[in-house]
């Protein structure tokens, strides 16, 4: 039971962070399919910083440096999507898919260059990112994620910025008519998405293991986060609940060998498939009632106002 709680919290926070990133982007009017790639870039940046740090450095500084690197690199990578979608008015789905493929290729090249070999595996210490409560080893990203959840809610629903951001995703022409810079707000939404996606990528890669193979990227977690965002109806606390729900399924693969589930004799691949199967089943029943931002995915043309 403790293992289930541990991995549910670990994966739930990751899904929540990335889904919150998608929420900000889509509330601005930009569909961020590139969350998978942003996670890879953020995870790679954080891992490279962590692996490069001297072992004598204070753990808090290692965590801070890795998180900042992941967040900044995630934001920089998201700028590619923002420029293509907002300035060039490119198809956001195609652009995001291309960035997902590019991210994995970049990660493999940089990882192999870092190792000086043909292996894309990078080893590091994850101890600075872990803490214990009652004998249960947890990720430092759990309290950080809760803080970011509350901040996201406040920013989205209690500030002028959040009101303007949502206006740009619902009716950009009306927002523009009252003096809101739609392009700037959409850039802000995508950048925040990159920030949260990058941190989410680091939270996925580092705490659970001490070696990561970047040939596998983040194994579809970014796409699962999109399902979490939709199931959570683009609302922060709903997203948190949806993330924990899907995280239970994702955790089963990690605990199957050490629980009663081992008696079933099922392959771990079956458990790895469960969250994706659950997402398809749930979304097939709930998609008709989804209330997505009305202008998401639609490039804004100032001349058509």
Residue ranges and their predicted role:
Residues 104-133, 253-262, 288-298:
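Extracellular/periplasmic helix-loop junction at the C-terminal end of a transmembrane helix
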Residues 152, 170-184, 257-305:
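Cytosolic-side transmembrane-helix boundaries in multi-pass membrane proteins
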Residues 24-45, 86-99, 164, 209-223, ...:
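Short, non-helical or kinked segments that cap or interrupt transmembrane helices
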Residues 1-18, 31, 45, 54-65:
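Membrane-interfacial amphipathic/re-entrant helices at transmembrane-helix boundaries
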Residues 93, 119-125, 137-144, 186, ...:
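Loop-to-transmembrane alpha-helix initiation sites
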Residues 212-276:
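Transmembrane alpha-helical segments in multi-pass inner-membrane proteins
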Residues 57-102, 147:
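Alpha-helical transmembrane segments within multi-pass membrane transporters and channels
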């Amino acid at each position: 039971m403790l293992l289930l709680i541990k991995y549910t919290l670990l994966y739930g926070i990751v899904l929540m962070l990335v889904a919150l990133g998608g929420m900000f982007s889509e509330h601005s009017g930009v569909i961020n399919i590139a969350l998978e790639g942003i996670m890879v870039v953020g995870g790679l940046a954080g891992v490279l910083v962590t692996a490069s740090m001297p072992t004598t450095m204070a753990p808090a500084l290692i965590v801070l440096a890795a998180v900042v690197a992941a967040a900044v690199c995630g934001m920089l990578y998201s700028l590619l999507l923002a420029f293509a979608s907002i300035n060039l008015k490119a198809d956001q789905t195609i652009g995001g898919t291309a960035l997902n493929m590019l991210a994995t290729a970049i990660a493999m090249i940089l990882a192999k260059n870092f190792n000086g070999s043909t292996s894309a595996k990078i080893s590091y210490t994850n101890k600075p990112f872990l803490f214990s409560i009652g004998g249960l080893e947890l990720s430092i990203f759990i309290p950080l994620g809760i803080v970011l959840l509350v901040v996201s809610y406040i920013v989205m629903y209690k500030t002028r910025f959040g009101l303007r951001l949502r206006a740009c995703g619902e009716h950009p022409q009306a927002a523009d008519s009252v003096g809101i810079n739609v392009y700037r707000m959409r850039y802000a939404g995508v950048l925040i998405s990159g920030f949260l996606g990058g941190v989410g990528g680091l939270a996925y890669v580092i705490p659970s293991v001490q070696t990561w193979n970047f040939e596998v990227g983040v194994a579809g977690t970014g796409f699962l986060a999109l399902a979490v965002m939709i199931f959570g109806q683009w609302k922060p606390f709903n997203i948190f609940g949806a993330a924990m729900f899907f995280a239970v399924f994702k955790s089963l693969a990690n605990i199957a060998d050490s629980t009663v589930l081992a008696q079933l004799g099922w392959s771990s691949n079956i458990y790895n498939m469960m969250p994706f199967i659950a997402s398809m089943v749930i979304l097939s029943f709930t998609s008709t009632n989804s209330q997505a931002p009305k202008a998401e995915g639609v490039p804004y043309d100032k001349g058509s106002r």
